[in-house]
């Protein structure tokens, strides 16, 4: 008979249970349905989104393998950072301004450094108050480069965006609430592995790249 915590049992039949041999990854293309949310993403074919924490420094292949893999793309911005449904920070390439220099005008390409995706900063300069400040990236060290090397003097928090969307290439765009200007945040990265059998399931929709991946 069942109780308040467990279901009923049959005392005359006791099984031996079953063991799980393998968990296979299905990378085949599936039909997609719209969720009505501009920040939801899906992957057609091979590949994974890369997620982790804010402080993970990608300076080697081992560090790259330290990121978590997932194919679930329910994204949103929390406290300035792009996160998945469990609060893990999504990695990619943020927009930089002219070369590696910071400024309020985005360049035509993102940084080459794989970093946590975050919103541009909000300018406090009287001549450009509210503008999105695209923090530069030092290609040699990967460190942030702020205007005048003094972020506290020229920026205050993250820019406020609305109408945020992600296109088929992973490009994240929105509209600056303060100025009405378009803002390109950056691009979501996709990771791939040579050997799917080397991908290890951890929990829920998450995987890690093992040594054989």
Task: For the regions a language model picked out, list residue spans one by one.
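Small-polar (Ser/Thr/Gly)-enriched, low-hydrophobicity segments
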Residues: 4-129, 144, 173
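Amphipathic alpha-helical assembly segments
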Residues: 85-213
């Amino acid at each position: 008979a069942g109780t308040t915590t467990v279901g009923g049992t049959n005392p005359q039949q006791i099984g031996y249970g079953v063991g799980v041999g393998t968990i296979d990854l299905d990378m085949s293309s599936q039909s997609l349905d719209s969720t009505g949310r501009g920040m939801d993403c899906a992957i057609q074919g091979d590949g994974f989104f890369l997620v982790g924490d804010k402080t993970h420094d990608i300076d080697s292949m081992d560090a790259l393998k330290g990121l978590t893999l997932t194919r679930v793309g329910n994204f949103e911005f929390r406290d300035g950072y792009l996160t998945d449904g469990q609060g893990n920070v999504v990695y990619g390439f943020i927009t930089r301004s002219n070369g590696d220099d910071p400024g309020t005008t985005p360049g035509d390409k993102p940084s080459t450094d794989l970093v946590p995706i975050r919103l541009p900063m909000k300018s406090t300069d009287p001549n450009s108050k509210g503008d999105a400040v695209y923090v530069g990236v030092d290609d040699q060290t990967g460190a942030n480069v702020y205007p005048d090397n003094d972020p506290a003097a020229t920026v205050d928090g993250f820019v406020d965006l609305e109408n945020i969307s992600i296109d088929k290439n992973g490009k994240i765009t929105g509209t600056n609430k303060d100025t009405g200007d378009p803002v390109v945040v950056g691009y979501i990265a996709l990771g791939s592995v040579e050997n799917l059998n080397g991908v290890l399931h951890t929990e829920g929709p998450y995987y890690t790249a093992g040594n054989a991946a």
